[in-house]
């Protein structure tokens, strides 16, 4: 009970969780762990993924650190399991989305590559602030949008490009931007986490959410 995240803690948890997921090899490892049911040691998981054991171990630890994977030690060996830390709402909702994805006969070939751009949209606190600003005020032109989030022009241009590649932005004929609701369950879980952050007093880059409609 006392370990559950507060709204103030949820935003950094969200972008750090997304950062851990925004990697094709890490997504592949997550699928392998799910398929193995926690019965395969790290060395076997690495072999199936075609990764060096130290690299696989590093990636698995990153997923465990964000609460997405559980870890068990048996007979001197390390096993990762599809048991999220339920005290971390983002990890739990993302894990539930992955379970649903894996139950549907398995994701299609190339699923990792297709998921990464959308996940990357949530993997930086400035991009969260930018999406949150559009949720509050849909249809902003880029200049008004940048002014709303107070991000330097060069940085704004970079994050704007990342969001465009993610497919989560829509621009009308006048260049005004709105957030597009994600269609895949993984990005949908991340989006729901962003939208669940209650309004907070603004003391820096805004992390508040809104009930404004999105497309």
What do these predicted regions represent?
Residues 2-14, 31, 35, 84-136, ...:
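Amphipathic alpha-helical dimerization/coiled-coil segments
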């Amino acid at each position: 009970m006392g370990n559950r995240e507060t709204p103030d803690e949820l935003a950094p948890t969200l972008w750090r969780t997304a950062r851990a997921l925004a990697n094709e090899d890490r997504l592949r490892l997550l699928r392998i762990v799910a398929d193995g049911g926690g019965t395969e040691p790290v060395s076997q998981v690495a072999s199936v993924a075609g990764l060096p054991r130290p690299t696989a171990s590093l990636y698995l630890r990153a997923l465990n650190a964000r609460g997405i994977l559980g870890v068990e030690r048996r007979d001197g060996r390390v096993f990762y399991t599809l048991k999220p830390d339920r005290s971390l709402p983002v990890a739990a909702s993302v894990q539930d989305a992955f379970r649903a994805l894996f139950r549907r006969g398995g994701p299609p070939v190339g699923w990792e590559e297709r998921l990464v751009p959308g996940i990357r949209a949530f993997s930086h606190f400035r991009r969260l602030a930018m999406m949150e600003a559009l949720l509050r005020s849909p249809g902003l032109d880029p200049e008004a949008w940048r002014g709303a989030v107070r991000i330097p022009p060069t940085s704004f241009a970079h994050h704007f490009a990342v969001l465009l590649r993610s497919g989560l932005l829509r621009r009308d004929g006048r260049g005004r931007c709105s957030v597009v609701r994600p269609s895949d369950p993984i990005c949908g879980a991340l989006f729901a986490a962003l939208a669940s952050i209650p309004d907070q007093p603004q003391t820096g880059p805004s992390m508040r959410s809104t009930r404004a409609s999105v497309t």
